[in-house]
Amino acid sequence: VIHPSAQIHPSARLGNAVVVGPLAIIEANVSIGNQCEISAHAIIKKGSVLGDKVKVDHFAVIGGDPQDIHFNPSTSSNVSIGDSTVIREHVTIHRATSEGGTTIIGKNNFIMAGAHVAHDCNTGNHVILANGCMLGGHVNVGDHAFVSGGVAVHQFCRMGKGSMTSGNAVITEDVPPQGLAHSRNKISGLNLVGMRRRGLSNEVIAEIKKAYHWVYAPAGNCIALAESALKSGEFTTPEALEFLDFFLGGKRGRFVQPE
Protein backbone atom coordinates (compact mmCIF):
# COMPACT_ATOMS: atom_id res chain seq x y z
CA VAL A 1 0.00 0.00 0.00
CA ILE A 2 1.49 3.29 -1.09
CA HIS A 3 -0.09 6.56 0.01
CA PRO A 4 -0.75 8.89 -2.95
CA SER A 5 1.19 11.73 -1.29
CA ALA A 6 4.39 9.67 -0.98
CA GLN A 7 7.24 10.55 -3.37
CA ILE A 8 8.96 7.51 -4.87
CA HIS A 9 11.68 7.88 -7.50
CA PRO A 10 11.07 5.80 -10.65
CA SER A 11 14.40 3.99 -10.17
CA ALA A 12 13.55 2.85 -6.63
CA ARG A 13 12.82 -0.87 -6.25
CA LEU A 14 10.15 -1.97 -3.79
CA GLY A 15 9.48 -5.57 -2.80
CA ASN A 16 6.16 -7.26 -2.14
CA ALA A 17 3.68 -6.00 0.46
CA VAL A 18 5.59 -2.78 1.17
CA VAL A 19 3.68 -0.02 2.98
CA VAL A 20 4.67 3.61 2.34
CA GLY A 21 2.95 6.27 4.43
CA PRO A 22 1.88 9.85 3.69
CA LEU A 23 4.59 12.28 2.56
CA ALA A 24 7.35 9.68 2.81
CA ILE A 25 10.21 10.18 0.35
CA ILE A 26 12.10 7.35 -1.34
CA GLU A 27 14.93 8.59 -3.53
CA ALA A 28 16.75 7.24 -6.58
CA ASN A 29 18.20 3.72 -6.67
CA VAL A 30 16.81 2.76 -3.28
CA SER A 31 16.10 -0.95 -2.78
CA ILE A 32 13.43 -1.96 -0.26
CA GLY A 33 12.75 -5.60 0.56
CA ASN A 34 9.50 -7.43 1.13
CA GLN A 35 7.02 -6.49 3.84
CA CYS A 36 8.77 -3.28 4.84
CA GLU A 37 6.93 -0.33 6.38
CA ILE A 38 8.02 3.22 5.64
CA SER A 39 5.99 5.52 7.88
CA ALA A 40 4.73 9.03 7.21
CA HIS A 41 7.44 11.66 6.64
CA ALA A 42 10.29 9.13 6.68
CA ILE A 43 13.05 9.74 4.12
CA ILE A 44 15.09 7.00 2.45
CA LYS A 45 17.96 8.70 0.64
CA LYS A 46 19.50 7.65 -2.65
CA GLY A 47 21.14 4.24 -2.91
CA SER A 48 19.99 2.95 0.47
CA VAL A 49 19.29 -0.78 0.72
CA LEU A 50 16.69 -2.19 3.13
CA GLY A 51 16.22 -5.91 3.69
CA ASP A 52 12.91 -7.64 4.37
CA LYS A 53 10.52 -6.65 7.17
CA VAL A 54 12.30 -3.41 8.03
CA LYS A 55 10.24 -0.74 9.77
CA VAL A 56 11.23 2.92 9.43
CA ASP A 57 9.19 5.21 11.64
CA HIS A 58 8.09 8.83 11.30
CA PHE A 59 10.71 11.47 10.41
CA ALA A 60 13.61 9.02 10.35
CA VAL A 61 16.24 9.75 7.68
CA ILE A 62 18.23 6.86 6.23
CA GLY A 63 21.28 7.47 4.03
CA GLY A 64 21.87 11.17 4.55
CA ASP A 65 25.25 12.72 3.78
CA PRO A 66 27.97 12.27 6.42
CA GLN A 67 28.66 15.10 8.83
CA ASP A 68 32.24 15.30 7.61
CA ILE A 69 33.53 18.67 6.45
CA HIS A 70 35.78 16.97 3.89
CA PHE A 71 33.01 14.86 2.35
CA ASN A 72 32.34 15.24 -1.36
CA PRO A 73 28.58 14.89 -1.97
CA SER A 74 29.26 13.35 -5.38
CA THR A 75 30.78 10.29 -3.67
CA SER A 76 28.80 7.13 -4.38
CA SER A 77 28.16 5.38 -1.05
CA ASN A 78 25.16 4.08 0.83
CA VAL A 79 23.50 2.55 3.89
CA SER A 80 22.47 -1.11 4.21
CA ILE A 81 19.79 -2.15 6.73
CA GLY A 82 19.43 -5.84 7.63
CA ASP A 83 16.20 -7.84 7.78
CA SER A 84 13.68 -7.27 10.58
CA THR A 85 15.35 -4.15 11.91
CA VAL A 86 13.18 -1.52 13.60
CA ILE A 87 14.14 2.14 13.20
CA ARG A 88 12.06 4.47 15.34
CA GLU A 89 11.13 8.14 15.09
CA HIS A 90 13.76 10.77 14.21
CA VAL A 91 16.63 8.29 13.84
CA THR A 92 19.42 9.40 11.48
CA ILE A 93 21.77 6.94 9.78
CA HIS A 94 24.39 8.46 7.46
CA ARG A 95 25.99 6.92 4.41
CA ALA A 96 29.69 6.08 4.18
CA THR A 97 32.39 8.61 3.31
CA SER A 98 34.43 6.59 0.80
CA GLU A 99 33.59 5.73 -2.78
CA GLY A 100 31.63 2.49 -2.78
CA GLY A 101 31.53 2.40 1.02
CA THR A 102 28.56 1.26 3.11
CA THR A 103 27.28 2.07 6.57
CA ILE A 104 26.00 -1.30 7.77
CA ILE A 105 23.14 -2.03 10.16
CA GLY A 106 22.73 -5.75 10.83
CA LYS A 107 19.64 -7.91 11.18
CA ASN A 108 17.10 -7.68 13.99
CA ASN A 109 18.44 -4.40 15.31
CA PHE A 110 16.22 -2.12 17.38
CA ILE A 111 17.20 1.53 17.00
CA MET A 112 15.14 3.71 19.30
CA ALA A 113 13.88 7.26 18.82
CA GLY A 114 16.40 9.99 18.16
CA ALA A 115 19.46 7.75 17.92
CA HIS A 116 22.23 8.74 15.50
CA VAL A 117 24.47 6.36 13.56
CA ALA A 118 27.27 8.20 11.77
CA HIS A 119 29.06 7.38 8.54
CA ASP A 120 30.90 4.08 8.10
CA CYS A 121 29.52 2.47 11.26
CA ASN A 122 28.95 -1.27 11.36
CA THR A 123 26.51 -2.88 13.77
CA GLY A 124 26.10 -6.62 14.13
CA ASN A 125 22.84 -8.50 14.62
CA HIS A 126 20.39 -8.14 17.51
CA VAL A 127 21.91 -4.81 18.54
CA ILE A 128 19.87 -2.33 20.59
CA LEU A 129 20.61 1.39 20.34
CA ALA A 130 18.45 3.21 22.87
CA ASN A 131 16.93 6.69 22.68
CA GLY A 132 19.26 9.52 21.81
CA CYS A 133 22.50 7.55 21.74
CA MET A 134 25.14 8.70 19.27
CA LEU A 135 27.67 6.61 17.39
CA GLY A 136 30.54 8.56 15.84
CA GLY A 137 31.99 7.64 12.48
CA HIS A 138 33.48 4.16 11.93
CA VAL A 139 32.16 2.76 15.22
CA ASN A 140 31.83 -1.03 15.26
CA VAL A 141 29.14 -2.60 17.47
CA GLY A 142 29.15 -6.36 18.02
CA ASP A 143 26.19 -8.75 18.00
CA HIS A 144 23.79 -8.48 20.95
CA ALA A 145 25.37 -5.27 22.26
CA PHE A 146 23.13 -2.82 24.12
CA VAL A 147 23.94 0.90 23.97
CA SER A 148 21.73 2.75 26.46
CA GLY A 149 20.04 6.12 26.11
CA GLY A 150 22.17 9.22 25.71
CA VAL A 151 25.45 7.34 25.29
CA ALA A 152 28.07 9.09 23.15
CA VAL A 153 30.57 6.82 21.40
CA HIS A 154 33.71 8.36 19.90
CA GLN A 155 34.65 7.66 16.30
CA PHE A 156 36.51 4.41 15.55
CA CYS A 157 35.58 2.83 18.90
CA ARG A 158 34.58 -0.83 19.15
CA MET A 159 31.68 -1.99 21.30
CA GLY A 160 32.26 -5.70 21.82
CA LYS A 161 29.79 -8.51 21.33
CA GLY A 162 27.24 -8.72 24.14
CA SER A 163 28.52 -5.58 25.86
CA MET A 164 26.20 -3.20 27.65
CA THR A 165 26.80 0.50 28.19
CA SER A 166 24.84 2.42 30.83
CA GLY A 167 22.88 5.58 30.12
CA ASN A 168 24.65 8.86 29.31
CA ALA A 169 28.08 7.23 29.32
CA VAL A 170 30.89 8.75 27.27
CA ILE A 171 32.94 6.12 25.47
CA THR A 172 36.18 7.09 23.75
CA GLU A 173 37.91 3.72 24.25
CA ASP A 174 37.04 0.15 23.21
CA VAL A 175 34.57 -1.89 25.29
CA PRO A 176 35.42 -5.63 25.34
CA PRO A 177 32.89 -8.38 24.59
CA GLN A 178 30.38 -8.94 27.40
CA GLY A 179 31.72 -5.87 29.24
CA LEU A 180 29.59 -3.53 31.39
CA ALA A 181 30.70 0.02 30.59
CA HIS A 182 29.58 3.17 32.36
CA SER A 183 30.43 6.81 33.11
CA ARG A 184 33.48 7.94 31.13
CA ASN A 185 35.46 4.96 29.85
CA LYS A 186 34.85 2.81 32.94
CA ILE A 187 34.10 -0.91 33.16
CA SER A 188 32.47 -2.52 36.19
CA GLY A 189 32.50 -6.18 35.20
CA LEU A 190 30.66 -8.48 32.82
CA ASN A 191 27.13 -8.50 31.44
CA LEU A 192 26.15 -11.68 33.29
CA VAL A 193 22.41 -11.18 32.79
CA GLY A 194 22.85 -10.81 29.05
CA MET A 195 25.06 -13.89 28.80
CA ARG A 196 22.57 -16.01 30.71
CA ARG A 197 19.67 -14.76 28.61
CA ARG A 198 21.53 -15.79 25.48
CA GLY A 199 21.99 -19.28 26.89
CA LEU A 200 25.70 -19.33 27.69
CA SER A 201 26.52 -22.18 30.05
CA ASN A 202 27.91 -21.70 33.55
CA GLU A 203 31.19 -23.22 32.38
CA VAL A 204 31.52 -20.73 29.52
CA ILE A 205 30.63 -17.79 31.76
CA ALA A 206 33.17 -18.93 34.35
CA GLU A 207 35.91 -19.00 31.73
CA ILE A 208 34.98 -15.52 30.47
CA LYS A 209 35.17 -14.30 34.08
CA LYS A 210 38.62 -15.85 34.39
CA ALA A 211 39.73 -14.11 31.20
CA TYR A 212 38.32 -10.81 32.45
CA HIS A 213 40.23 -11.04 35.74
CA TRP A 214 43.41 -12.08 33.93
CA VAL A 215 43.29 -8.90 31.85
CA TYR A 216 41.88 -6.45 34.37
CA ALA A 217 42.82 -7.60 37.90
CA PRO A 218 46.52 -6.71 37.70
CA ALA A 219 47.67 -3.21 36.87
CA GLY A 220 49.21 -3.50 33.46
CA ASN A 221 48.88 -3.30 29.72
CA CYS A 222 45.65 -4.96 28.56
CA ILE A 223 47.16 -6.09 25.28
CA ALA A 224 50.19 -7.73 26.90
CA LEU A 225 48.01 -9.38 29.54
CA ALA A 226 45.61 -10.73 26.90
CA GLU A 227 48.57 -12.09 24.93
CA SER A 228 49.88 -13.87 28.02
CA ALA A 229 46.45 -15.35 28.69
CA LEU A 230 46.22 -16.71 25.15
CA LYS A 231 49.71 -18.21 25.40
CA SER A 232 48.93 -19.83 28.75
CA GLY A 233 46.72 -22.50 27.22
CA GLU A 234 44.23 -22.12 30.07
CA PHE A 235 41.41 -20.85 27.87
CA THR A 236 39.58 -23.13 25.46
CA THR A 237 36.02 -21.88 24.94
CA PRO A 238 35.36 -19.77 21.81
CA GLU A 239 33.74 -17.07 23.96
CA ALA A 240 36.72 -16.64 26.28
CA LEU A 241 39.13 -16.69 23.34
CA GLU A 242 36.99 -14.08 21.60
CA PHE A 243 37.18 -11.89 24.71
CA LEU A 244 40.97 -12.12 24.78
CA ASP A 245 41.42 -11.74 21.01
CA PHE A 246 39.47 -8.49 21.17
CA PHE A 247 42.39 -6.77 22.90
CA LEU A 248 44.74 -7.76 20.10
CA GLY A 249 42.48 -6.73 17.24
CA GLY A 250 42.00 -3.00 17.69
CA LYS A 251 43.80 -0.19 15.93
CA ARG A 252 43.79 2.26 18.84
CA GLY A 253 45.01 0.07 21.72
CA ARG A 254 42.88 1.88 24.29
CA PHE A 255 40.27 0.12 26.43
CA VAL A 256 37.79 1.06 29.14
CA GLN A 257 39.25 0.54 32.62
CA PRO A 258 37.96 -0.34 36.11
CA GLU A 259 37.63 2.50 38.59
Predicted regions and their residues:
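Structural signal for interior beta-strand "rungs" in well-ordered beta-sheet cores
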Residues: V1-K186
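Terminal amphipathic alpha-helical/low-complexity segments used for targeting or macromolecular assembly
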Residues: V1-S5, P10-S11, N16-A17, K53, ...
